[in-house]
Amino acid sequence: MVTNVATALIGVGDMWIVGQLGDAPTQGAVDIGAKLFAALFTVMNFLKTGTTGLVAQAGTRVGQHAQAQVLVKGVVVGLAIAAMLLLAKPVLLPLMLDALGAEARVRTAAVVYADIRYWSAPAVLVNFALIGFLVGRRRMREVLAIEIFYNLLNIALGLWLALGLDWGIAGIGWSSFIAEFAKLAATGALIWYLAGNDLRAALADRANISLRALKPFLAINRDLFLRTVVLMVAIAMLTRLGAERGAVTLAANGIVYQLFVLAALLLDGFENAAQVLNGERAGDGDRAGFTALVRAILWRCLGVAILLSAAFAWAGGMITDSFAATPAVAA
């Protein structure tokens, strides 16, 4: 759960840094960019969730070599999708910005931010698979350490580039880009240290990256992909409605959205637990244990959701004031 909160902080950090610039259109541009990449990358989150569940199952059924095979498949799929996204960038990025419908000044700033962050696609998608592998092997402390490093680096670079060097919104984009590849390097090095021998064997077996071997991996993630697409379409529609009402409304909605993401990822910690623990039970064929665990996690998730709602009702005003670029945005 704590790990997922750390994941959310990169978007929160970007919104806080741009708030210090004191310009509502620029803050609105970062909001548009953040949601654009949420739509673009989050629909690929099946690389993480699918890898987590399959790695957990493989650990009980076969062993570490099978877990390495799952990781190789996840990385191959991630790189393939990233390559397609980069090839489609000249067409896809303008279309997505048009769909969000921002006014001219906001769009100009959003193009600067989005054009830089878009190139981090390979790192983001491969990181999904790498983090899923670590979660599936219950390496949560290591994941938490990586996420904290990632977020602190992003915030430090953002402050230095955007405010210290006066790069503005471009500095925020570059800080996120650098942080993503630094996270990839750190996560990759850790996994190679933990499972280098198994990974070498899995990479040497070309059958692991054949289309036939990848089909089951893709099939099991189909429903996750479709669910996330529907969610991202809804968020994009809300962003467009905010953009049509001007930069101040867009910036205000962006702050609320980051709090929503923070809460969602906190609750998503229960999903991570379910993926690992139920993956192990599925691997053992323990149907009764599987059902009991699902019920227990749902009740705990409901309790945390109620507590979060109460916290936002009590302190929501103070939180939004600290992020707002201008008093009008806070209001």
Task: Map each language-model feature to its residues.
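Residue-level signature of transmembrane alpha-helical cores of multipass secondary-active transporters
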Residues: 1-4, 38, 78, 117, ...
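N-terminal transmembrane alpha-helices
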Residues: 1-16, 20-21, 35-50, 54, ...
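Helix-terminus/linker motif at the lipid-water interface of multi-pass membrane proteins
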Residues: 8-28, 97-104, 160-167, 225, ...
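Small-residue-rich hydrophobic transmembrane alpha-helices
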Residues: 29-87, 127-136, 142-143, 252-316
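Short runs within selected transmembrane alpha-helices of multi-pass transporters and secretion channels
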Residues: 45-48, 116-136, 143-151, 172-188, ...
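Short membrane-interface helical motifs at transmembrane helix boundaries
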Residues: 84-115, 307-331
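Membrane-interface helix-loop junctions in multi-pass transport and translocation proteins
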Residues: 151-185, 189, 316-318, 331
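Interhelical loop/hinge segments that connect adjacent transmembrane helices in multipass membrane
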Residues: 176, 188-231
